[in-house]
Amino acid sequence: YEAAYQAFVSKRGQIELNLREWMKPISLTPDNLHIGIHFLGENISAALQLGDISYVSGEVAWLKVLLKFHEAQPEQLIHFMKAYSEAVKQNINSQGKPISDWLTAEIEKLKAE
C-alpha cells in the first residue's frame, strides 16, 4: 500500500479537482460535495497508511447518509464512486490499483442494495 499511498498523496489535489469538475451536475451543494470529497480522501489516505483500504468502507455508509439527508438519488453515490475511481485511474494509473479495486468492490455492493 506504500506506493499507492505515495501516489495518492502526491496527486490527491488533481484527483479531487477532476472529481469536482465531473460531479457538477449532481444535486449536492458545492460545500457538501467538497466535504464528501475531502473526508473520503482523508480516509483513503489514512487507510493506505494503515495498510488496509477496507477501513474506508465506513465512509461509504456516511456518504449514503449525507446523500439521503439532501434527498439525492441513491444512484448519485454510485456515480460519485465511479467518478472517483476514474479520477484515481487517470491520475495515478496502476499505483492506484488498491484504491480503484476497493472503489469497484464498493460500487458493486451499492448496486446490490
Ranges and model annotations:
Residues Y1-K82, E86-E113:
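Core of compact, soluble alpha-helical bundle domains
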